[in-house]
């Protein structure tokens, strides 16, 4: 039976742990939240922190607001790879950074304490709790997200240029303006909002013992989102391979083109069109390797053999493209 570590924690308790080291892995999809989702989050948090628009009705000892699960597993580098919760965790980081940018310059005692707590959520700290602002608690390696560096730069510096238009930048600006409006409207409440978010908003971290277990949990919990497919995992292996060769951008474009092609060809009952392509290529490889067993192993199990060696060469990727072209035109030319 798979072992799970599940322990409900406040935002502050989870983010400020000394060992907290989150990674948005390369097989995840790019950040997708926009102003609509950020507005909903802001409104929900405000209504929770100030019930009936009254600061004094909040009970800091008992009031809690559940933000949802964070499904992770510890990879070989000791980082917690985020399988589920990427969008809300990223957005919470942007929100806290926006609070820090505003409160960090204030000299009021409560603002100073609040800023200290936020520092411990965003950056790694020394034994005295002082932050190393070059060492974030979260990193992103999302393969197809060209704007991820903007996210990391926002967390490190809190600044933006006018030319930065990513979802990260737009949402950060959104929160900055909401905080300005909040301080202008409720100046006496300024110290309570971020503290109540950090101390009383609850996340449910679920740490699985392996990637496969984490993905299964995600698929079970997430009935609204789009679970990661086998092809997403395979894409990460190709991405690492081509990045090491200095051909990352070329690969990303070819992969996007292949996705478009497969979407127009395959319409599987289960799985994604890209999963269907990998399934058909698996049968080709099984025949080429002389595998005669009538029992077909699971798709991911087949490709992950020998540390995904089949996905770490140029020919496999070219064969996949050729196979998709064949399905479109009827001419599959695979090289051995």
PLM features per residue range, with description:
Residues 137-336:
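Polyanionic (Asp/Glu-rich) segments that form extended negatively charged tracts
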Residues 88-105:
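Short active-site loop/helix that positions an aromatic residue
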Residues 4-22, 125-154:
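Short, compositionally biased low-complexity segments
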Residues 33-45, 63, 87-88, 164-172, ...:
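Phosphate/oxyanion-binding active-site loops and adjacent basic polyanion-contact surfaces
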Residues 48, 99-102, 224:
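Phosphate/oxyanion-binding loops and surfaces in catalytic or ligand/nucleic-acid-binding neighborhoods
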Residues 1-83, 93, 191, 200-204:
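Short alpha-helix boundary/capping and kink motifs at helix termini
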């Amino acid at each position: 039976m798979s072992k799970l570590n599940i322990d409900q924690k406040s935002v502050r308790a989870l983010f400020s742990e000394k060992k907290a080291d989150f990674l948005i892995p390369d097989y995840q999809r790019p950040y997708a939240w926009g102003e609509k989702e950020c507005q909903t989050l802001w409104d929900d948090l405000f209504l929770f922190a100030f019930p009936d628009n009254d600061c004094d009705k909040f009970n800091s000892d008992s009031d809690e607001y559940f933000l949802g699960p964070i499904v992770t597993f510890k990879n070989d580098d000791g980082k917690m790879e985020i399988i589920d919760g990427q969008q809300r965790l990223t957005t919470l980081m942007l929100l806290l950074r926006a609070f820090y940018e505003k409160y960090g310059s204030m000299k009021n005692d409560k603002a100073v304490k609040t800023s200290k707590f936020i520092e411990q959520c965003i950056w790694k700290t020394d034994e005295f709790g002082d932050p190393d602002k070059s060492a974030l608690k979260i990193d992103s390696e999302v393969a197809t997200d060209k704007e991820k560096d903007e996210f990391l730069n926002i967390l490190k510096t809190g600044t933006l240029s006018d030319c930065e238009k990513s979802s990260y930048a737009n949402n950060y600006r959104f929160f900055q303006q909401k905080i300005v409006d909040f301080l202008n409207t409720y100046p006496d409440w300024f110290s309570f909002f971020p503290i109540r978010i950090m101390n009383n908003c609850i996340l449910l971290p679920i740490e699985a013992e392996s990637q496969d277990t984490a993905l299964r949990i995600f698929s079970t919990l997430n009935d609204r989102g789009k679970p990661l497919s086998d092809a997403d995992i395979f894409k990460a292996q190709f991405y690492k391979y081509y990045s090491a060769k200095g051909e990352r951008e070329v690969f990303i474009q070819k992969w996007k083109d292949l996705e478009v092609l497969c979407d127009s060809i395959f319409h599987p009952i289960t799985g994604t069109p890209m999963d269907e392509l990998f399934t058909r290529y698996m049968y080709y490889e099984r025949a080429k390797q002389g595998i005669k067993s009538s029992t077909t192993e699971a798709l991911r199990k087949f490709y992950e053999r020998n540390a995904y060696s089949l996905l770490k060469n140029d020919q496999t990727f070219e064969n996949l493209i050729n196979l998709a072209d064949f399905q479109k035109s009827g001419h599959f030319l695979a090289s051995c």
